[in-house]
UniProtKB/Swiss-Prot annotation:
The keyword Ligase does not apply. PANTHER family: NUCLEOLAR COMPLEX 2 AND RAD4-RELATED, NUCLEOLAR COMPLEX PROTEIN 2 HOMOLOG. Its main location: nucleus. A motif (Nuclear localization signal 1) lies at residues 673-680. InterPro entries: Noc2. It is found in: Nucleus; Nucleus, Nucleolus; Nucleus, Nucleoplasm. Residues 30-41, 52-67, 661-672 have a biased composition (Basic and acidic residues). Together with SWA2, probably involved in pre-ribosome export from the nucleus to the cytoplasm. The lineage of its organism: Eukaryota, Viridiplantae, Streptophyta, Embryophyta, Tracheophyta. It holds the Pfam family Noc2. This is Nucleolar complex-associated protein 2.
Amino acid sequence: MGAKDDKKRVKKLKSKKLEAEEELNNVQEIDAHDIVMEQKSDKKRGKKVKSKKAEAEEHEEELKRLQEKDPDFFQYMKEHDAELLKFDATEIEDDADVEPDTDLEDTEKEGDDEATKMEIAKKVHVQKTITASMVDAWSKSIEDEAKLGGVRSILRAYRTACHYGDDTGDDQSTKFSVMSSEVFNKIMIYVLSEMDGILRKLLRFPEDTRGTKETILELTNTRPWKNYNHLVKSYLGNSLHVLNQMTDTEMITFTLRRLKHSSVFLAAFPSLLRKYIKVALHFWGTGSGALPVVSLLFLRDLCIRLGSDCVDDCFKGMYKAYVLNCQFVNADKLKHISFLGNCFIELLGTDISAAYQHAFVFIRQLAMILREALNTKTKEAFRKVYQWKFIHCLELWTGAVCAYSSQSELRPVAYPLAQIITGVARLVPTARYTPLRLRCVRMLNRLAAATGTFIPVSMLLVDMLEMKELNRPPTGGVGKGVDLRTLLKVSKPAVKTRAFQEACVYTVVEELVEHLSQWSCSVAFFELSFIPTIRLRSFCKSTKAERFRKEMKQLISQIEANSEFVNKKRALIKFLPNDLAAESFLEDEKKAGKTPLLQYAEIIRQRAQQRNESLVESDVIVGENSAVFGKNAPSSDDEDDEDRMEKGAAAFNSSWLPGSDSKEKEPEEEKTKKKKRKRGGKSKTEKKQDEQGLGEDDVVEDFVLSSDEEEEDLFDIGGDKDEDDAVDEIADPETKTSKKTKGTYKTWHKAYKKTKKKKARVAS
């Protein structure tokens, strides 16, 4: 019985020692930085440490009493388990001032006494300067021996690196300090490349999957998560902090690409998730190079893995960023806007049901803006519709409906969208807004082709042929080539040129052929092409330009040939027009492209492409397939270790450190532009925009997607005015004032000449 009692007593002592050692380890694992912040918000932790210290002292007294009462058993313990008796309560007392780094995000209370700070600071260890050899030693201990201490040390160093240069005053609570950019780069490369895999092993994350929201929710109930979740939060929180400090595109791209693998852990930290979405949206909307692509992939990964937690925020934020990018438009920026639109459409595919809800709301807002313009007929209301933001939003939703036309969720918004586009095209039917109407026609053709629904586009096109500007001889000379794809409105002098007339007529022919070729195999082709054919014959009689007459006669002959081809096939069938069998009528001929109009449409497309290429001075091509992700887009998500390290070394190869002066020198081009503005001159781009009608009249800054905006009393367009004059007053606010000041023009012009001469002398 004595032996059994001895064993029980040994077990009891061992368990007490293990508990004490566990408490000691927990205290030793604490990060020194957060004790200052933690004790500001919670003073009860001091009591906790005191209770642990009291328990340790009590255990030490028990050992002393045991030696006095039962010296034989104490001797037995010395011989068989001497380690159990080696216990010192001062170990806890020495390390009782350190707290774990688990609160990286919560805001701390302010206003504690400076004396308390100084007392705590005295107990903290002296800061150590991190060297490259220390980083190598930590990484080796993690890789070879899988030591948890190495993980904690490298994360502390990572925190110090991310917060380097922060305005912390005389804060000495951090254990490490980074002194060189070489060490900073080394820490960043290693942690961003390897920490995701290390954390997954610690948390015993399933290896066969990258995880979803459900996986994380299950993981939060496990013991490894309770032990190591503060490491995950530390990694994600510090990474977010350094992302906000970075200025180099390659650094941000590499950091965001690596963080994408750990994005699933954000399901456990909702506030961090919102901040990451905000940062990624900012980089997507303003970044250059591969950064927008990587940001899109990051957001897409979040939407797929976390679902409803972030889908709404991502959709709304991306739509807002897209609209902001459409505020100021020129020929060079159209490609970027098209790319952003394709990114948004790609993101909508992650949750089509949620996409429908957002599409319904935003399309309804566009409809309300159009309705306001139709009801009020004010200059300001028209300008809200006839601007790039509104048109690009229509193109965005057109692309979305076309991309997901095979899915039933987005098909219901096709009809209201087509109604809005038709209303926009007919709002101000003048020659100066021909480019805008042609854009609307292209959108309607895309919708019709994607949904298989007939939309009466031909009337919008043949109405343009009857405009007086196209039936008069050109009084403005030949003029420069007009690219109608990059404009919403052309200038007054350009309307009177021969180049504008040719561009209008040829584009109308191209879009009309595109529309009719979609229904060239329809059983009702003769009926739907009858009225457009009559209107085209009328234009042939009225036009005085032989080149236009020749073009229209060729189109009419192709339409008649196609009608004859369809009528011959239709005479052989026995089903009624409302029969479902009508859908399969001439299906084989349509796939093979054997109808006369389909063959003619192919020729017209090639001619249009050649004409557009001759007008484009740069490599900007605007269209549904124009936006590409670029050469720097990652080919796959999985990278091997060497490739990962190489990319990291390429990104973190500069002497940049957080907190350093990131303000870059102003480019010489920007300086030149500013000098020209001061002298009153204009840049080449601005002059080109003035010639093409891309001036201030087409850019409206107060675009609001809401019907609640208060309207001011503006000039109302009456019905007795000439149509062109009315539209000029909408687009040119200075028209009225110029008539009033006509009498004082000479006086003003003399003063202007004198001022200009003075500026020229000062500039020289």
